[in-house]
Amino acid sequence: LFDPPDSXPXY
């Protein structure tokens, strides 16, 4: 399962 981009820190 992959977390959505908003879940993690962005660049």
Swiss-Prot record:
Give the superkingdom in one word: Eukaryota
Molecular function as annotated in GO:
metal ion binding; toxin activity
The residues that cross the membrane are none
Presence of the UniProt keyword Metal-binding in the record: yes
What GO CC terms are in its UniProt record? extracellular region
Main localization, broad class: secreted
| Keywords of the record | Blood coagulation cascade activating toxin, Calcium, Disulfide bond, Glycoprotein, Hemostasis impairing toxin, Metal-binding, Secreted, Toxin
Keyword GTP-binding annotated: no
PTM comment: N-glycosylated.
Chain ranges of the C-type lectin domain: 10-11
Q: Where in the cell is it found?
A: Secreted
Tissue specificity is: Expressed by the venom gland.
**Function, as annotated:** Regulatory subunit of the blood coagulation factor X-activating enzyme. Activates coagulation factor X (F10) in a calcium-dependent manner by cleaving the Arg-Ile bond at position 234. Weakly hydrolyzes insulin B chain, fibrinogen and some components of the extracellular matrix in vitro, but does not activate prothrombin or plasminogen.
Summary of subunit composition and partner proteins: Heterotrimer; disulfide-linked. The heterotrimer consists of 1 heavy chain (a metalloproteinase) and 2 light chains: LC1 and LC2.
Relay the record's extra comment. Answer: Calcium is required for ligand binding.
The Swiss-Prot or TrEMBL record describes its family as follows:
Belongs to the snaclec family.
Q: What is this protein called?
A: Snaclec factor X-activator 1 light chain 2
Tell me the organism's taxonomic lineage.
Eukaryota, Metazoa, Chordata, Craniata, Vertebrata
